[in-house]
Amino acid sequence: RTAGGWGAAIGAGAFLGLSAMFYTLFFVVAVFTVVLMGLVAWATLWWQQREIAVHQPRAPRLGVFRLLWPILLRLIVMGVIAAILALIVWAPYLAKVLTGHLPESNTALHYLPESGSRLAFPMFDFSEPLLGALCLLGTLWLVVRVASSRRAQALAISVVAIYLWSLASMLVTAAGTTGLAFRLEPILQVLLAAAGAFGFVEGARAVYQAVDEPRRFRAATAVVAVLGALAFTQSIPGILNAEITTAYTDTDGNGVRADKRSPSAVSHYGRIDQVLTEQTGRPRDETVLLTADTSFLSYYPYFGFQALTSHYANPLADFPARAAEIKRWTELKSPAELIDALNHSPWRAPDAFLFRRSGENYTLRLAEDVYPNDPNVRRYTVEFPGTLFADPHFRITDIGPFTLVVRS
């Protein structure tokens, strides 16, 4: 006897829970796909019952709920497992929401590049010929085998789910948001490429049998498969060209570029961190820093007062109000006014500021949401007059192009 699919249900629940911990979009799409699979399974059982009733009128029939219950029970188990794992990450946020701290702003879905306004058809995209051919082969295999192969059915439903999500994403654009369907294109490519691998194996077997099983056919097929894999492997740098360029030209946390050229201002981050910890006398996880150079926080995990853009900000942080508060600080007239404003900030005020210098003033590059434009953010600069920090309450240190201001 088999386990009746319970092993798969537990594994799927664990997968969904882990995806909820790392990438919400993929989690929601995965849940949508699993539910769609359940609906297809239920509809198939119902259709089979209907066919039996037509050909065998006296045969016993199960009701709609009796057909649905085993599927629904497995979905419930998956949901419980996924929820338990997801709460490891989501519990603090949900606790805040449930106690009345509702999100003031949430623009995570406000992004509509050109690729998000059309359906993706990787099987007809031959800018990367091998990937396109593999996806096309996968599409053909799904059409041919969807009625007889569980693997094909699972992959086909997943592909259909992505296309349905893409259509829904286009539809909700009218409501001022999106489903970020363009982010699912890599998943679509993986699904079709996996189907293409199955199609190649089964197609080669079918040809082998059709030509009377010649002795050297298997060897020839293996050679073609190996050469195809090598060719595809060699094309990966072309597919990842932008990412590879960034890897070689970006300055790392040690102030070094992989291409050995002069590093960017990031090379000063180590010194900034050293001075900041010395002057605050506190560990990083007890310090709030306001800076527009948020990559600094990637290397040194201080708490940031403001995110780079609203799309990546915690919805509970009220990104627009924080931006307005920062702008208000720049318009104050004296250090005493600034100190008072910081002491009465609606949120925990910055313990330090990391600026760029502009003459006698200090600048921050902030951003605001301008969806549905592409790019979806507008960058703007705010200037703090240097005179606002001319007080013993502030300790000022120039480091490279940066100015670090630490509150006493």
Sequence positions of predicted segments:
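Short periplasmic/luminal acceptor-recognition loop of GT-C membrane glycosyltransferases, typified by
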Residues: 228-330, 341-370, 392-407
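Alpha-helix capping and helix-loop boundary segments enriched in small/acidic/polar residues
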Residues: 2-9, 23, 175-178, 259-263
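Membrane-helix boundary/interfacial segments in multi-pass membrane proteins
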Residues: 100-127, 155-217, 243-245
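Signature aromatic-anchored transmembrane alpha helix within multi-pass, membrane-resident enzymes
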Residues: 83, 204-245
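Transmembrane catalytic cores of multi-pass membrane glycosyltransferases
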Residues: 8-9, 17-158
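Alpha-helical transmembrane segments of integral membrane proteins
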Residues: 23, 27, 185-192, 224
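Transmembrane alpha-helical segments
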Residues: 1-3, 14, 32-40, 44, ...
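Aromatic-anchored segments of alpha-helical transmembrane domains
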Residues: 16-20, 82-90, 159-171, 227-235
